[in-house]
Amino acid sequence: CCGIPNAACHPCVCTGKC
């Protein structure tokens, strides 16, 4: 994620705030 297209990745994973 974080700019890399991935359906299995959630935005919160990038920020570390899930």
From Swiss-Prot:
Contains 3 disulfide bonds. They are not added, since framework IV presents two different connectivities (I-V, II-III, IV-VI and I-III, II-V, IV-VI). Expressed by the venom duct. It is found in: Secreted. GO terms for molecular function: acetylcholine receptor inhibitor activity; ion channel regulator activity; toxin activity. The keyword Disulfide bond applies. Belongs to the conotoxin A superfamily. Alpha-conotoxins act on postsynaptic membranes, they bind to the nicotinic acetylcholine receptors (nAChR) and thus inhibit them. This toxin selectively binds to the fetal (alpha-1/beta-1/gamma/delta subunits) mammalian muscle nicotinic acetylcholine receptors (nAChR). It blocks the elicited currents completely and dissociates very slowly from the fetal muscle receptor. This is Alpha-conotoxin PeIVB. It comes from Conus pergrandis.
